[in-house]
Amino acid sequence: MKNLSTKFQPHSHHHTQESQNQEKEAIEEEQEQQEERARCEWDFSLTTIVSSGSNISSTPAISDALGVIEFDQTNSIIATGGIARKIRIYNFKSLFAHENTSHNEHEITCLDHARACDYYICTPAKLSSIRWKPRSDGRVLGSGDYDGVVMEYNLERRIPIFERDEHGGRRVWSVDYSHWDPVLGASGSDDGTMQIWDTRCESGEGVATVQPGGGRRAVCCVEFNPFGGPIVAVGCADRKVYGYDIRMTVDPVFVLDGHRKTVTYIKFLDNVTLVSASIDGCLKLWDSDNSNVIRSYKGHVNNRSFIGLSVWRNGGLLGCGSENNKVFVYDRRWGEPIWVHESNRPVGRDGCGGGFVSSVCWRQVEEDQCTLVAGGSDGDLQVFQGRRKS
């Protein structure tokens, strides 16, 4: 008689071994997933609030929404602009009084704009964009406004020194300067064009007119490569990001296609890696060499507004606002946020239709400490400090 149990014993052993291997693989996969989950290596705290009133619980100033925040090249001066038709200039140390001092990390300094800012310059229209001009020693600031005008201001004399109206009165969403050739600037507008201009020539023809995608979809953001070189990146309402060599702008050198809605911001993380934001509610990390998406970042709410985007290159962190009135920080390595801060201001009746975080900017210094400044639709500035966990 054949021994059936003996006959099938090896097969049974094979199944047991296979089952053990599957369990081992499942455990390893779970461990890998655990390792890939976002972890926060930073301790963040809110240190300062600068509001339009003397009390952070006072009624928000609806007409004082902050659309843009920019540190100068020394990271010691902050400029802000927005609906109030003012460029406000702040000394960073006056806002961040706790730097390099021992303090209660839960203590928050409350200031108001009137006393906190060094001075302000009134502008003829609402501002959508401001940018410090390279190699100007912090004396010149460029702006783009709702009336379609690009201007430069001499901050020492506090007067406009340059003006161009390239966009036929259509709103300018974004301005930037070339770091490769600082006399060149660019502006993107609702008219569907990016204009490249020479700041030495106030009148006459611009250097180039670029119509990304060949359509008339709004150009919402422009950024020159801050590491030098002739590349400028352009984000558009056609859901794409285009890269152009300013020496030959007939065709783009790269096209980044992956967002589902309008691209609102584009930032260089390094020479070839870019981060984009869109009202499809996500950020994307791109390799411009092959036009591939490296990673998508989700968690914040963004389906209609400009909420700001800033990258801290030393630490690999991304900051953005949100339509639910929160500040979000992502690590470039993970697709979910590593830190979220909710404002004290109430949101609207629909949960996100009232106040929202409308602008953010990292201070580009150090590696074990970081500073993020956020502006709101209520006109508040918030200063956050982060320290790397030991």
Where in this protein do the model-derived segments appear?
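Intrinsically disordered terminal extensions that flank WD40 beta-propeller domains
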Residues: 1-64, 72, 93, 387
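WD40-repeat beta-propellers
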Residues: 87-93, 144, 150-154, 175, ...
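Blade-loop segments of beta-propeller domains
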Residues: 101-132
